[in-house]
C-alpha cells in the first residue's frame, strides 16, 4: 500500500480498511474533511490523499505526474493521469475521514490553477467501490470554464 498525501493532512486510521481491497490498476483519491468535521466543499474535485498498490506503472504516468502538488487542480489532474492509463479511481471519503489541519489560512487563486484534463470523482463508501454510479467523470477544464466548479457535479 502506497500513500501520497499533502503535508497538512492527518490520516484517518480507517485508511487501512482499504488494504484488503487494493488491486492492480486501482487508485483511491480521497477528499478531505475540514477541522470542523465537515467534508470539504466540492468533494468530487478536492482530494489530498492518493492510495494505490505498489506496482509498476506506465512510463507516461511517471512523465505526466511531474506536476507540483498544492496547486489548485493538481489533485484532479493527477487522478486523471492514472484514469487515462487504465486505473479505476474511487473516492471512499464517506468512510475515511482524513482531516485538513492547516496552520494558516490560504486562498487558492485561479492564476495558479492547473487547467486541462480533470477527473471528477464522486464521494462514496468503501462498499460502493465498483458500482457504476460512483465511477469518475473525465472532463476537460479550459481556463474560461471556471464556472464548472461553482455549478457542481451531480454524479
Segments and roles (model prediction):
Residues 2:
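Short aromatic/hydrophobic "clamp" motif used to bind/position activated sugar donors
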Residues 9-84:
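Conserved catalytic core of nucleotide-sugar-dependent glycosyltransferases
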Residues 68-155:
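C-terminal catalytic/acceptor-binding lobe
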Amino acid at each position: 500500500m502506497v500513500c501520497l498525501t499533502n503535508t497538512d493532512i492527518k490520516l484517518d486510521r480507517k485508511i487501512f480498511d482499504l488494504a484488503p481491497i487494493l488491486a492492480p490498476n486501482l487508485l483511491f483519491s480521497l477528499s478531505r474533511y475540514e477541522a470542523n468535521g465537515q467534508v470539504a466543499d466540492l468533494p468530487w474535485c478536492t482530494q489530498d490523499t492518493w492510495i494505490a498498490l505498489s506496482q509498476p506503472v506506465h512510463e507516461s504516468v511517471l512523465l505526466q505526474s511531474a506536476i507540483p502538488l498544492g496547486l489548485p487542480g493538481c489533485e484532479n489532474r493527477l487522478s486523471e493521469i492514472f484514469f487515462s492509463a487504465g486505473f479505476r479511481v474511487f473516492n471512499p471519503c464517506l468512510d475515511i475521514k482524513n482531516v485538513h489541519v492547516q496552520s494558516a489560512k490560504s486562498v487558492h487563486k485561479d492564476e495558479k490553477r492547473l487547467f486541462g484534463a480533470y477527473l471528477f470523482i464522486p464521494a462514496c463508501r468503501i462498499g460502493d467501490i465498483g458500482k457504476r454510479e460512483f465511477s469518475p467523470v473525465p472532463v476537460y477544464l479550459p481556463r474560461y470554464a471556471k464556472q464548472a466548479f461553482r455549478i457542481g457535479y451531480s454524479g
